[in-house]
Amino acid sequence: MKLAANLIVFAAVLLLVAAALLYTQQRRMIFPAPADYPAAPPPGFRIVHTQTSDGLRLAAFYRPADEGKKTILFFHGNGDNLSGALQAVRGPAAAGHGLMLVEYRGYGDNPGSPSEKGLYRDGAAAMRWLTDAGVAPQQVVVAGNSIGSGPATEIALRNDVAALVLVSGLSSLPDVVAEAMPVVPRALVRDRFDNAAKLARVRAPVFLMHGDADTLVTPANLERLRAARPDATVALVAGAGHELAYTAAAQAILVGWINGSLAARP
C-alpha cells in the first residue's frame, strides 16, 4: 500500500516537472528561429527598419508595388525567416505586387524574444511603416503562412485592409497542439493565436488556402476557419502538405485571386 502511494506521488511529481518544463520552454520549440539568414535582400527589395511599440528596431525586406498593384504584408511561418519568405512570394513579386516581408523579433539579427503579443507588435510596426511610406491600408493584402496566420489575422482585424489571406493557417495554436499531442492540456499553451475567434470580425475579404495532405496544421484547422467565416473564399489544394506556400501552384492561385477578386476594389 505504501509502495503504491509512493509511486503515485512520484508520478505526480514527474508530471508537474514535465508540465513546468513544457510551460517555460515551449517558446523555444514554437519559435526556433533558423540560422540560415540572407546576407542581403535580392534585387528589387531593400532593407527597411520598423519601430515597435515596446521599443524594438526590426529589419524587414520591402519592394514597392508596380502601378495599380496591391502591396502584400507577409508573415512567414515559425520555422522560417526572410529566406523562406522570399521563396513564398516569388509569384506575387513576378506579378508586380509590392511586398513587405516582416521579420520577427528574435529572428535573424533582430532584438527581442518572440511571443504571440510580440508578433502582434511586430506586425503593427510594419503596418505603421507602410502607412508612413504612403501605402494606404486599403491597398494592403495581409497574408500569413502557418503561424504567420496569427499576426496576419490580428493586423487585418485592427486595420481597414484590402484582404486577409491565410495559407496553411491555424484555427488556434492550442488546436494544433491538441491534435499533435493530445496529452498536453490546452491551458499549458501560452501563445494562443486564436484566429477562428477573430475571423468573423475582420471586415476585409478573406481567402483561405490549405493543402489536403498537411499533417502539421491539418485540414481540420481549415474547416474551423471556414466555419468561423462562411463567406471566405477557400482553396483546398490536392496532394499539398505544409510546404504549400512555397509551391508555384499555390502562388499562382494567390496571384489569380488578388488580381481577380480584388481588382475592382479601390
Which functions belong to the PLM regions below?
Residues 7-51, 266:
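An N-terminal hydrophobic leader/cap segment in hydrolases
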Residues 53-132, 150, 156:
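Membrane-embedded segments
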Residues 88, 195, 204, 218-227, ...:
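Short alpha-helix in the alpha/beta-hydrolase fold that links the catalytic acid
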Residues 129-133, 137-183, 198:
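Primarily recognizes the serine-hydrolase "nucleophile elbow" in alpha/beta-hydrolase
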Residues 212-217, 242-244:
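Acidic catalytic loop of the alpha/beta-hydrolase fold
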Residues 240-250:
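Catalytic histidine-centered segment of alpha/beta-hydrolase-like enzymes
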Residues 248-266:
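Catalytic active-site module of serine/aspartate enzymes centered on a nucleophile-bearing elbow/loop
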